[in-house]
From Swiss-Prot:
This is Scavenger receptor cysteine-rich type 1 protein M130. It comes from Sus scrofa. Residues 47-1044 are extracellular. The lineage of its organism: Eukaryota, Metazoa, Chordata, Craniata, Vertebrata. Expressed in monocytes and macrophages. Detected only in one population of monocytes (CD163+) which is in advanced maturation stage. Disulfide bonds join C76-C140, C89-C150, C120-C130, C183-C247, C196-C257, C227-C237, C290-C354, C303-C364, C334-C344, C397-C461, C410-C471, C441-C451, C502-C566, C515-C576, C546-C556, C607-C671, C620-C681, C651-C661, C743-C807, C756-C817, C787-C797, C863-C924, C894-C904, C953-C1017, C966-C1027, C997-C1007. The gene is CD163.
């Protein structure tokens, strides 16, 4: 029985021993397996792969071999084509792909076949970036080893022949020592551009086929070339392979480059050097241009090329004279920014579908003979639109005229934006025969001449349609409630509304301008306190800041009223002299002649019924002509015009101006013909008199018009809102005076593309719906938009019509365009937004920014743009060499002054893979700092917010608040919470007040406080702190963190290696102990078994008590 018990005990102990041993063995195997897998995966990561060519005649040809895991192998030719060869050649520094070879053309390799079914797009940077079956996976033998033939370009040449100079002619290419031609199949201007650029012959003017420059001989090297125009050499375009074609030499292609074309442009048969029929010199002969599609964009390019930068009109068959000879160009289509007419799209040279009765012409201007004005509206910012071109004056026809066009006029005249546009009623008997027709402005142009499709001249217009405008800067004054027309309460018209002016907002200089504008002479007195009675309605809340020399009140600067509100009891009034615009005419000198007055804009002779020497003496003094010598009768200086003023002056002779004399007109008798006042003054040779303004106005031009005003329109008609930049956001349209949204029904990339194009934001990356950028307000203007993508404006697309929809604002449409840009700093801590790798969002993707040329000024721009601080540091680059990320831009160099990174020069946008060592890593200064302290952990508390540094008010400031600041700055604990500007008074905003921290907050702005910037404190109450420690710089803290991480990683590897070694040693030791048992008896067996079981139990117990994984022995 005891023996049986011992056997059972023995078996039980053996089972426990085996279970414990198996547990340890499995763990050891798993660790080793994981480490091995990591090593294998790392070896396939890309850094240890190499590419070479073997068996070829030179370094740029041979069998393709790839080195993976320190072992060279070949590539199978399945799917092997020119796109793949392009990648191989470029990767090896032999940029031109010549031929794709297979079937062991360069002899069969040996060893591994690493890749099969390789498929490239052609733009990959390495062969292993292309798709393939997987490393070592294939279904071929070495008899299918792939090869390539590349070229570094040294053995390739190109030229143009048979054209008379090196920049035009038949294209010929030298390859393998033989010259050959290019087939014209699919040959276009893109191919010609590559050829001209490669030969340094300027831009491509034209291309030709059908052996236009004669048939060549020898090989035909290329056929069906596909170029995008950006390639550096013709052989870098996609093609089927050298020498592969289905042509003969009757299809040889040729090109004409700008430097070889001898192209010139001129105008003939015009009235000026900047107008007439257009003619182009091509291949030594002058010819004309057909007017098919001829518009203002084409004319703009032609005028600019001729040195007459403003296109007045594009002339077609109606006005241009007929030329002779060739018609060189037809269907010209320019964008308007081209520098030469032949850079625009057009048919091939000499191909046309018209006769000389359709010859195109232009009327251009150098700008000196163009004038725009508003007339008859009470100020220079309102009235009928008049245009003067080359001394010819005309009106603007109201046909197709709207608020967009009016807005351009107002802006061009410095009159703000358009408040309204209307038509002016005139009788047909006073009609003008000269008209300006404007068919399309977008509202953003700087001048009317920049609008599209405007024509000048002889087309008819209904004479009830003269365009009239009122601009926002229009201010028309009047005097109301006075005894005479030139005195009274000042009232000013803004748009259609009249209002009074507060006496504190109107100076003597402003009164002087008002009197001059009203043709009322000079100011006599300025009266406040509603001297001429209280007005009603609007009181304008603006101060007139005139200097006194302005001709109109609307030309004076205005500013918001500085003293708050005003009532009608303070309406200002003015008394003007009225009669100071007076002159002598028809005399032999400026100091003698017939007396004429200007009253309310009209000049007329003064009746002599009450004219005497006292009046004459004041006038001579006023005109600086000495004293009056005589007042001859009988109209010795002529009778003058029909207008004779009957006003009677009652001067005493002591007044300085005629306006100071008493004047009466009431009841004055009629003046008979010839009864006009005259005077001869003594003269004063030391002074001269400038002639008075002799202009007259036609009373009929002041006829009141019947106006159909409409709501103001802003300068923009389309915008993107709440997207973080001008090229992303909710789409909003301005229509009928209101901004509104677009419904997302049927909204797609074609629609979004039109929006992006219209806003000059590139192309559409995403067409968002469901109010992705938040719900808008106001009208929903458009629904079910269906664009084809070619429209220039979103409202040109098909839709239900303005305001017709079945949506709500939760369906507001939005877009993200390719030119939308954003900025961020990426760190391992997702909550850290002011330190990390610098990335920009562009063209729909995030990419890093290179560290080349990165300066503190650039870092400061980044930190300010992100709202982090006004400065920062360039952090050490990441040491991780296994990661490659896309980089967008490098060599950013910000000068002082830019607000955003987008304003700084850099290298061009170019997306490429970059290692972390090439990227920019930035640490912005903390949003909180201590100033004027004895250490960097004491001082006045300042916070970065809203783009500037500001202070914290000491109301409620205590040790808990200081504790948060010290912890946030890494300065230990707070020793003191300073008050009353303990470290001096700061400047700028006081950002926070009534801060009430508990003491455990992460940052000061996590504490309760008043709203940002709302404070009733002065800087004498600036808060401060004194902390217990001197803080390490943020950079050193990051360095310490990285060093700790590296040290911890090394320690972990060493510990793991020791553990594995210990486990292996333990297993071997137990095996030796088990062998010794067989010779040691039962007691030894039992002791070993119990010791093993006890060890397993203690290890398990230790694991449970030690969650950190510390496997130290428990005593």
């Amino acid at each position: 029985m005891d023996k049986l018990r011992m056997v059972l005990h023995e078996n039980s102990g053996s089972a426990d021993f085996r279970r414990c041993s198996a547990h340890l063995s499995s763990f050891t195997f798993a660790v080793v397996a994981v480490l091995s897998a990591c090593l294998v995966t790392s070896s396939l990561g890309g850094k240890d792969k190499e590419l070479r060519l073997t068996g070829g005649e030179n370094k740029c040809s041979g069998r393709v071999e790839v080195k993976v895991q320190e072992e060279w192998g070949t590539v199978c030719n399945n799917g092997w084509d020119m796109d793949v060869v392009s990648v191989v050649c470029r990767q090896l520094g032999c940029p031109t792909a010549i031929k794709a070879t297979g079937w062991a053309n360069f002899s069969a390799g040996s060893g591994r076949i690493w890749m099969d079914h390789v498929s490239c797009r052609g733009n990959e940077s390495a062969l292993w970036d292309c798709k393939h079956d997987g490393w070592g996976k294939h279904n071929c033998t070495h008899q299918q080893d792939a090869g390539v033939t590349c070229s570094d370009g040294s053995d390739l040449e190109m030229g143009l022949v048979n054209g008379g100079n090196r920049c035009l002619g038949r294209i010929e290419v030298k390859f393998q020592g033989r010259w050959g031609t290019v087939c014209d199949d699919n040959f276009n201007i893109n191919h010609a551009s590559v050829v001209c650029k490669q030969l340094e012959c300027g831009s491509a003017v034209s291309f030709s086929g059908s052996a236009n420059f004669g048939e060549g001989s020898g090989p035909i090297w290329f056929d069906d070339l596909v170029c995008n125009g950006n390639e550096s050499a013709l052989w870098n375009c996609k093609h089927e392979g050298w020498g592969k074609h289905n042509c003969d030499h009757a299809e040889d292609a040729g090109v004409i480059c700008l430097n070889g074309a001898d192209l010139k442009l001129r105008v003939v048969d015009g009235v000026t050097e900047c107008s007439g029929r257009l003619e182009v010199k091509f291949q030594g002969e002058w010819g004309t241009i057909c007017d098919d599609g001829w518009d203002s964009d084409d004319a703009a390019v032609a005028c600019k090329q001729l040195g007459c930068p403003t296109a007045v009109t594009a002339i077609g068959r109606v006005n241009a004279s007929e030329g002779t000879g060739h018609i060189w160009l037809d269907s010209v289509s320019c964008h308007g920014h081209e520098s030469a007419l032949w850079q625009c799209r057009h048919h091939e040279w000499g191909k046309h579908y018209c006769n000389h009765d359709e010859d195109a012409g232009v009327t251009c201007s150098d700008g000196s003979d163009l004038e725009l004005r508003l007339k008859g509206g009470g100020s220079h910012c309102a009235g009928t639109v008049e245009v003067e071109i080359q001394k010819l004056v005309g009106k603007v026809c109201d046909r197709s005229w709207g608020l967009k066009e009016a807005d351009v006029v107002c802006r061009q005249l410095g009159c703000g934006s358009a408040l309204k546009t209307s038509y002016q009623v005139y009788s047909k008997t006073k009609a003008t025969n000269t008209w300006l027709f404007v068919s399309s402005c977008n509202g953003n142009e700087t001048s009317l001449w920049d609008c599209k499709n405007w024509q000048w001249g002889g087309l008819s217009c209904d004479h009830y349609d003269e365009a009239k405008i009122t601009c926002s800067a229009h201010r028309k004054p009047r005097l109301v409630g006075g005894d005479i027309p030139c005195s009274g309460r000042v009232e000013v018209q803004h748009g259609d509304t009249w209002g009074t002016v507060c006496d504190s907002d109107f100076s003597l200089e402003a009164a002087s301008v008002l009197c001059r504008e009203l043709q009322c002479g000079t100011v006599v007195s300025l009266l406040g306190g509603a001297h001429f009675g209280e007005g009603s309605g609007q009181i304008w809340a603006e101060e007139f800041q005139c200097e006194g020399h302005e001709s109109h009140l609307s030309l004076c600067p205005v500013a918001p009223r500085p003293d708050g509100t005003c009532s009608h009891s303070r309406d200002v009034g003015v008394v003007c002299s009225r009669y100071t615009q007076i002159r002598l005419v028809n005399g032999k000198t400026p100091c003698e002649g017939r007396v004429e007055l200007n009253i309310l804009g009209s000049w007329g002779s003064l009746c002599n019924s009450h004219w005497d020497m006292e009046d004459a003496h004041v006038l001579c003094q006023q005109l600086k002509c000495g004293v009056a010598l005589s007042i001859p009768g009988g109209a010795p200086f002529g009778k003058g015009s029909e207008q004779v003023w009957r006003h009677m002056f009652h001067c005493t002779g002591t007044e300085k101006h005629m306006g100071d004399c008493s004047v009466t007109a009431l009841g004055a008798s009629l003046c008979s013909s010839g009864q006009v006042a005259s005077v001869i003054c003594s003269g004063n040779q030391s002074q001269t008199l400038s002639p008075c303004n002799s202009s007259s106005s036609d009373p009929s031009s002041s006829i009141i018009s019947e106006e159909n005003g409409v709501a103001c329109i802003g300068s923009g008609q389309l915008r993107l809102v709440d997207g973080g930049g001008r090229c992303a956001g909710r789409v909003e349209v301005y229509h009928e005076g209101s901004w509104g949204t677009i419904c997302d029904d049927s909204w797609d990339l074609n629609d979004a593309h039109v929006v992006c194009k219209q806003l000059s934001c590139g192309w559409a990356i995403n067409a968002t719906g469901s109010a992705h950028f938040g719900e808008g307000t106001g009208p929903i203007w458009l629904d079910e938009i269906n664009c084809n993508g070619k429209e220039s404006h979103i409202w040109q697309c098909h839709s239900h019509g303005w305001g017709r929809h079945n949506c709500r604002h939760k369906e507001d449409a939005g877009v993200i365009c390719s030119e939308f840009m954003s900025l961020r700093l990426i760190s391992e801590n997702s909550r850290e937004t002011c330190a990390g790798r610098l990335e920009v969002f562009y063209n729909g993707a995030w990419g890093s920014v290179g560290r080349n040329s990165m300066s503190p000024a650039t870092v400061g721009v980044v930190c300010r743009q992100l709202g982090c601080a006004d400065r920062g540091d360039i952090s050490p680059a990441s040491s991780d060499k296994t990661v490659s990320r896309h980089m967008w831009v490098d060599n950013v160099q910000c000068p002082k002054g830019p607000d955003t990174l987008w304003q700084c020069p850099s290298s061009p946008w170019k997306k490429r893979l970059a290692s972390p060592s090439e990227e920019t890593w930035i640490t912005c200064a903390n949003k909180i700092r201590l100033q004027e302290g004895n250490t960097n952990c004491s001082g006045r508390v300042e916070i970065w917010y809203g783009g500037s540094w500001g202070t914290v008010c000491d109301d409620s400031w205590d040790l808990e608040d200081a504790q948060v600041v010290c912890r946030q700055l890494g300065c230990g604990s707070a020793l003191e919470a300073g008050k009353e500007a303990a470290f001096g008074q700061g400047t700028g905003p006081i950002w926070l007040n009534e801060v009430k921290c508990k003491g455990n907050e992460t940052s000061l702005w996590d504490c309760p406080a008043r709203s940002w910037g709302h404070s009733d404190c002065g800087h004498k109450e600036d808060a401060a702190v004194t902390c217990s420690e001197i803080a390490k710089s943020r950079e050193s803290l990051h360095a310490t963190g990285r060093s700790s991480f590296v040290a911890l990683a090394i320690f972990g590897v060493i510990l793991l290696a020791c553990l594995i070694a210990f486990l292996i040693w333990t297993q071997k030791r137990r095996q030796r102990q088990r062998l010794s048992v067989f010779s040691g008896g039962e007691n030894s067996v039992h002791q070993i078994q119990y010791r093993e079981m006890n060890s397993c139990l203690k290890a398990d117990e230790t694991d449970m008590l030690n969650p950190s994984g510390d496997h130290s022995e428990v005593q």
